[in-house]
Regions:
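Conserved beta-strand-loop-beta-strand hairpin that lines the nucleotide-binding pocket
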Residues: 1-46, 84-85, 89-195
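Conserved short strand/loop->alpha-helix "switch" segment adjacent to the catalytic nucleotide/phosphoryl-transfer site
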Residues: 53-89
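Donor/substrate-binding cores of folate-linked one-carbon enzymes
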Residues: 50
């Protein structure tokens, strides 16, 4: 059966999905040893301001990254909630935090999360509840039940924002989330009348 599946997959997908290329079991998930970078763009005509998130225990690293991205995007005028940013930030664990880079664009309304990990082979299924590649050592830091990106997608769908998942250059993934302008709107049926 594995041969039939392999025949239908591209070379990159074969590399990403092949059990012999999955070295997560030997990876130390307790501490992030790499630096993450946050690039805040005022516009695309000038270089971004770059903030580095230094190596730290995994829980602290994820919290620091998500908090810094949230604060910088809000200060730039964005409205993407912390929970949405946190869910995507946690996904870097699947890439073993390899070259984690977050770009804040469009006055904080677009945030792009890029890595050079193994990538996401099934981009559509990654946005559906219950599909997960989390293994036991990751579950000390994330729920690991396949709910992260579906939560993000649901929020962005309700507020007329967008999420896209693409292959990065060479290897890895790029997840881009965008709010609807600077003031996303809830559907009328979810609004509360203020009297």
């Amino acid at each position: 059966m594995w041969k039939a599946v392999k025949a239908q997959m591209s070379e990159q997908e074969q590399y990403q999905e092949s059990p012999e290329n999955n070295d997560d079991e030997g990876f130390d998930f307790t501490h992030v040893n790499s630096v993450a970078r946050i690039a805040l763009y005022d516009n695309l005509l000038s270089a971004p301001r770059v903030t580095e998130i230094q190596p730290a225990p995994t829980g602290e690293f994820i919290e620091s990254l998500a908090t810094n991205v949230y604060q910088q995007s809000q200060a730039a005028g964005g409205t993407i909630p912390y929970t949405v940013i946190r869910e995507v930030s946690e996904n870097f664990i699947h890439a073993r935090f390899q070259e984690a880079t977050v770009s804040i664009l469009d006055h904080g309304c677009t945030i792009r999360f890029a890595d050079q990990g193994p990538g996401i082979a099934c981009k559509d299924r990654a946005q559906l509840p219950g599909f997960t590649s989390a293994i036991e050592p990751m579950k000390s830091y994330i729920r690991g039940v396949g709910s992260g990106l579906p939560i993000v997608k649901e929020y962005l769908d309700f507020t007329h924002g967008t999420i896209s998942i693409e292959d990065n250059l060479g290897t890895g993934s790029v997840v881009t989330i965008s709010a609807n302008g600077s003031n996303p709107q809830l559907p009328k049926e979810l609004e509360i009348d203020h009297v």
